[in-house]
C-alpha cells in the first residue's frame, strides 16, 4: 500500500498498447486497482467478490427501470437466436443469481481437469488445446462459467509461466498467487 496507508485504491483510465481490435478487449477502459497491506490471495478474492456483488446490488436497487428496459430488449433479441444460443436466464435473473450465490473457487489445475473431462474436449469441439501450462482461452472460460458451474468462477494458482513476473510464487515453485474472476456472458472481469 502507499506510504503506510493500509487500504488504498486508484481509479483511472487504462490504455492497451497492443492491438485491441477484438470484441473481447477494449483499447481504453477505466480500472480500479486496490492495494491492501498484509493481505493474501483469499483477501483479494473476497474483496473482488464483495465489490462486484455491491455494484450489481446497487444497480438492481437504483436503476430498476433501465435494467428492465435492457432485460426486455435482450429477451426480444435472443428470441431471434437458435435455442442453443439463448441464455437460460434473463439479464435480471442472472444479476440476481450473482448476488445471491457464492462464487465458485477453483485452482487452475482443477479448471484444466474439468475441461479435460468435458464433452466439448472429448468430442474435439474446443478450437484451442486444453493442457496444463497453457493459458485458458475464452471458450474454456465460457464453458466453466456457463455450462459447468453456471455462476461466476474464481480461478487461482496459475502456472508461473503464463502470469506476470512479479506475481508471488507459491510454495510448489510452479504456480503463482494470481486470480481471475470469470462472469457468465462476459469472461474475465477481475484479474
Segments from the language model and where they lie:
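A translation/RNA-centric and nucleic-acid-associated enzymatic feature enriched
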Residues: 1-57, 72-191
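Flexible, glycine/charged-enriched surface loops at secondary-structure junctions
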Residues: 61-71
Amino acid at each position: 500500500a502507499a506510504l503506510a496507508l493500509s487500504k488504498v485504491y486508484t481509479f483511472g483510465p487504462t490504455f492497451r498498447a497492443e492491438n485491441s481490435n477484438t470484441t473481447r478487449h477494449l483499447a481504453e477502459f477505466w480500472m480500479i486497482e486496490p492495494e491492501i497491506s498484509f493481505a493474501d490471495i483469499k483477501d483479494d478474492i473476497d474483496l473482488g467478490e464483495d465489490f462486484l456483488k455491491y455494484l450489481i446490488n446497487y444497480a438492481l436497487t437504483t436503476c430498476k427501470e433501465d435494467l428492465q428496459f435492457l432485460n426486455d430488449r435482450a429477451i426480444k433479441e435472443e428470441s431471434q437466436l437458435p435455442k442453443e444460443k439463448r441464455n437460460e436466464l434473463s439479464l435480471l435473473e442472472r444479476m440476481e443469481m450473482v448476488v445471491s450465490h457464492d462464487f465458485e473457487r477453483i485452482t487452475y489445475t482443477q479448471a484444466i481437469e474439468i475441461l479435460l473431462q468435458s464433452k466439448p474436449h472429448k468430442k474435439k469441439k474446443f478450437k484451442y488445446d486444453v493442457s496444463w501450462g497453457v493459458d485458458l482461452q475464452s471458450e474454456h472460460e465460457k464453458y466453466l462459467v456457463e455450462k459447468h458451474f453456471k455462476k461466476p468462477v474464481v480461478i487461482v494458482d496459475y502456472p508461473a509461466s503464463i502470469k506476470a513476473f512479479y506475481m508471488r510464487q507459491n510454495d510448489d515453485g510452479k504456480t503463482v498467487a494470481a486470480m481471475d474472476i470469470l462472469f457468465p456472458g462476459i469472461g474475465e472481469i477481475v484479474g
